[in-house]
Amino acid sequence: MRRELLLEKIETYKAIMPWYVLDYYQSQLAVPYRFTTLYEYLKEYKRFFDWLMDADLTQAPKIADIDLSTLEHLTKKDLEAFVLYLRERPSLNTYSTKEGLSQTTINRTLSALSSLYKYLTEEVENDQGEPYFYRNVMKKVSTKKKKETLASRAENIKQKLFLGDETLAFLDYVDKEYEQKLSNRAKSSFRKNKERDLAIIALLLASGVRLSEAVNLDLKDVNLNMMIIEVIRKGGKRDSVNVAGFAKGYLESYLAVRQRRYKAEKQDLAFFLTEYRGVPNRMDASSIEKMVGKYSEDFKIRVTPHKLRHTLATRLYDATKSQVLVSHQLGHSSTQVTDLYTHIVNDEQKNALDNL
């Protein structure tokens, strides 16, 4: 989502929230939380407060009037009823056959509520230096996590990775073959954005940065001489990320057309731009997800930008056998999350042996 639109949506949610949620929001800006995270949390709070009113657990006529005592005196049974509601409510997605929300979505909702409750019961200080209240009912609510071994997860993921020669083959396909299947009208749109789209895909495959990190790149953050980019990692930390050399040509080709094709002026700082009616804007995450999905589906299998991150990590581990190096490249503080790539590479080695 474009930053300007994201901030606009955040303000819309803030306008209907109780004062203590606004306090929480302001506090989290200092952490700092990403605006995308805060936006998702505000959406979850609206979902929760709407349910409180529908379930007659508050007499407030509107969300902004729900007082602190309502949250303070909610019971474990109340929260379990909310979880049951989420699990069984009709899906808003008309294309889905599921009756309720996924466990992943439910966990995200509970995570947002846990963060709010922790703030209200531990972090905030009133005039007497005490939290608003002490009883944190969220500590009594358990979340159900998907059980899956690393080996099982590796098996599921590796089918959606572009390993070995497929990394460059994917880029080559978008560059030289994709448009052959398009109508003349579709070709015109494809050619306008071809260099940009290739640059985005190449950067994701060559650096392993997160989608949000690619979206938030500015021109000043990209050093093609050193093949290093500066990104803001989770938690607000700046990091320098090395980029594999095969991406350089694609990035240079995009920069050669960026100003002219997207009507970019000096004040347009975003690295990846889109243009509508002569106005350039930062390309948003949703557009990049759709773009990657479209090209990858035509090439082999529909994947997300995060699978391109997994692709880079797996290839890097295969080349170096260093979990430390991979974790640094991905911006992780621990090597634990890179265990997945050892399983994928070990499976690939086993398959190679079986073919001898």
Swiss-Prot record:
- Chain ranges of the Tyr recombinase domain: 169-354
Cell division in keyword set? yes
The GO annotation for biological process reads:
cell division; chromosome segregation; DNA recombination
Active site as annotated: R210, K234, H306, R309, H332, Y341 (o-(3'-phospho-dna)-tyrosine intermediate)
* Coiled-coil parts of chain: none
Q: What does this protein do?
A: Site-specific tyrosine recombinase, which acts by catalyzing the cutting and rejoining of the recombining DNA molecules. Essential to convert dimers of the bacterial chromosome into monomers to permit their segregation at cell division.
HAMAP family recorded for this chain? Answer: Recomb_XerS
Q: Where in the cell is it found?
A: Cytoplasm
Does this UniProt record's set of keywords contain Magnesium?
A: no
Could you list this entry's UniProt keywords, alphabetically sorted.
Answer: Cell cycle, Cell division, Chromosome partition, Cytoplasm, DNA integration, DNA recombination, DNA-binding
Activity regulation description? FtsK is required for recombination.
Which GO terms label this protein's molecular function in UniProt?
A: DNA binding; tyrosine-based site-specific recombinase activity
One GO cellular component term, please give it: cytoplasm
Q: According to its UniProt record, where is this protein mainly located?
A: cytoplasm
Domain Core-binding (CB), residue spans: 16-121
Xref: Pfam families: Phage_int_SAM_1, Phage_integrase
Q: Which CDD domains match?
A: DNA_BRE_C (cd00397)
What is the official name of this protein in its record?
Tyrosine recombinase XerS
- Its family? Belongs to the 'phage' integrase family. XerS subfamily.
